[in-house]
């Protein structure tokens, strides 16, 4: 079975492999910023409310431009947008690092806003590109591999950050490089900049002229709005719930069970590995058990894990409380994430070809909105 699963991913179109490498490279930067950028900001003297305000700007960038982009790219080639994303994200990442280092607040704000825009370009364009470049036989594999890049980048970035922190410094003659947050972020940003080499090698066929929508202001009749809202309503509920809970899970374990950042990082590494494995199993499960089992049942189990984790606060003084909470946490994330590839495939097929770019943009906007609200709540 494992050999069959491996071959199904190996036999994907070359452009999908290039897109996956592009997503992985940019995700390295994204993960590194999530893991240590806030620590870097705090060490530079910024308060927690200021840090939350900076982070909210990257979601504003995605919120403001995702919907217009989704309308604009219908029927257009997506390679130029991937190239633009691979230029914007590393450049604005460097701008964030240096503006934080020198405490230039206006530049920090501009860089966060632009960084969010760059990541949004990749996210909004990836889903329709995958659907365009695959068939019904291998679209689940492509979407699953795309979903797995985030967890793989989490593992790789986490190991690299921990390794460089453990080494401490590098001496070459009279030159010494200290591996602090500033230098580590720069190293990973340079690694992420290699994404441009994958973007320029992507090839696309001609798109149908009849699918193009060049008028951003005449969209009422261009899309099946009732179908779109029906399709996206479950995602609205899931994104709101995730945005209001997941960003604070580390605080929950710290305040209720006394877990340190090191302990929680270890849990994060375990869950990232499981997310990667579970994501790769999605095509096999979807083809064997169908969408109902792969999406509805799996997400219901993930929600149950979240509820169990919260209930364990009532039993924090008992030794079994933390054990059950940790098990629920480790299982929740892989279960919820393994439903995403199948859900995205079902969503794109349900809304039809002419609505796919817009539904991808709306999906990105919803997740950005949920994290923006979380940043403001914090």
Predicted features along the sequence, with ranges:
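Helix-loop boundary and gating motifs at the non-cytosolic
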Residues: 2-64, 227-268
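Glycine-rich segments within core transmembrane alpha-helices of 12-TM secondary carriers
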Residues: 144-165, 364-374
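C-terminal ends and interior cores of transmembrane alpha-helices
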Residues: 87-102, 301-318
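C-terminal membrane-cytosol helix-exit motif in multi-pass small-molecule transporters
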Residues: 189-208
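Loop-to-transmembrane helix entry/capping segments in MFS-fold secondary transporters
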Residues: 48-49, 136-149, 261-262, 351-363
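Hydrophobic core of transmembrane alpha-helices in multi-pass small-molecule transporters
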Residues: 24, 92, 104-122, 320-338
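Helix-to-loop junctions at the C-terminal end of transmembrane segments
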Residues: 65-78, 165, 278-291
């Amino acid at each position: 079975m494992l050999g069959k699963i491996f071959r199904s991913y190996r036999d994907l179109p070359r452009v999908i492999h290039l897109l996956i490498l592009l997503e992985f490279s940019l995700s390295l930067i994204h993960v590194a910023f999530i893991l240590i950028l806030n620590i870097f900001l705090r060490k530079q003297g910024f308060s927690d409310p200021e840090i939350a305000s900076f982070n909210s700007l990257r979601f504003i960038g995605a919120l403001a431009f995702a919907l217009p982009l989704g309308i604009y790219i219908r029927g257009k080639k997506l390679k130029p947008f991937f190239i633009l994303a691979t230029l914007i994200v590393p450049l604005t990442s460097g701008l964030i690092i240096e503006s934080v280092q020198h405490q230039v607040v206006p530049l920090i704000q501009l860089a966060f806003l632009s960084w969010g825009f760059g990541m949004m370009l990749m996210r909004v364009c990836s889903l329709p590109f995958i659907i365009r470049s695959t068939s019904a036989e291998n679209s689940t594999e492509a979407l699953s591999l795309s979903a797995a890049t985030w967890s793989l980048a989490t593992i790789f970035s986490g190991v690299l950050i921990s390794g460089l922190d453990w080494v401490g410094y590098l001496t070459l003659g009279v030159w010494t490089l200290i591996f602090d947050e500033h230098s580590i972020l720069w190293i990973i940003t340079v690694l992420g900049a290699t994404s441009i080499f994958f973007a320029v090698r992507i090839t696309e066929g001609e798109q149908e002229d009849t699918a193009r929508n060049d008028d951003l202001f005449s969209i009422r009749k261009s899309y099946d709005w009732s179908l779109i809202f029906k399709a996206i309503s479950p995602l609205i509920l899931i994104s709101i719930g995730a945005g209001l809970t997941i960003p604070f899970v580390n605080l929950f374990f710290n305040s209720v069970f006394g877990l340190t950042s090191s302990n929680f990082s270890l849990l994060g590494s375990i869950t990232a590995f499981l997310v990667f494995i579970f994501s790769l199993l999605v095509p096999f499960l979807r083809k064997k058990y169908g969408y109902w089992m792969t999406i509805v049942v799996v997400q219901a189990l993930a929600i149950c894990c979240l509820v169990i984790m919260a209930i364990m606060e009532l039993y924090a003084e008992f030794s079994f409380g933390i054990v059950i909470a940790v098990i629920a946490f480790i299982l929740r994330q892989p279960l919820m994430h393994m439903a995403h590839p199948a859900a995205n495939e079902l969503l794109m097929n349900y809304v039809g070809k002419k609505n796919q770019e817009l539904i991808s943009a709306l999906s990105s906007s919803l997740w950005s909105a949920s994290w923006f609200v979380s940043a403001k709540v914090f």
